[in-house]
Amino acid sequence: MIYNGKKINFIDPAITNSLNPHKNSKGFCNAICPDQVCGTITKKNSKNISTNLNNRKNNPQNYDFDYDNIPEDNYIVFILESPHIEEFDTKNQIPIGPAQGNTGNNINIFLRDVIDGSPMFLTSLQMNFTYSLVLINAVQYQASQGTKPLDRKLTDENWINFWNENFKSDLIKRIKEIIKKSKDCKIINLCTFGHSGLHYFVNAELRVNGLSFYEGYHPSRNWAIPQRRKIW
């Protein structure tokens, strides 16, 4: 599917989101939320990590990830669940990008702490390498239907339906395209667990496709808890 002149996934454009606003929707949008480059992470030595994160609120389309034109680079890929209210300009019915709101704030605040608190992951990073940080949603549609407070049961049901229809295979295609063009690539599953174990859906699909990956807690609330700032 093409958006803003960029290939944002491998889904047939004929496959559309048929969801409508829910009675408790406070910010519904049925558009695709493209994956984006969030910034860079550099390992200068065994104990020195630097991060440089983008302000994606301004001209967010500039950061959309184009799967037709992937630079040869080093990548760290965060797999999230699905976009919610903050990820869209619902007034104009257009996407902003993944991990806005509390999720994005916690990535900005705690990213270095998370990496520093994950010895196995930190050791795996190449010395003096700069990695582009890519944020991708396993399901790029708003599974929550913009409900506020979040309707977890509804979100899980919609997410699983989207996952089984097309996003399961599409996620793997997206990740494989990034790996194909990367010098070094780290995949990290940060998808929420939800009430239905969504995190494990992603784990299983990565494993069955022979992809190496790390795991962690979703940043939205978990990274505010020191014990959950880790990748394993």
Question: Which residue ranges define each predicted feature?
Answer:
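A polyanion-binding, active-site-adjacent surface
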Residues: I8-I188
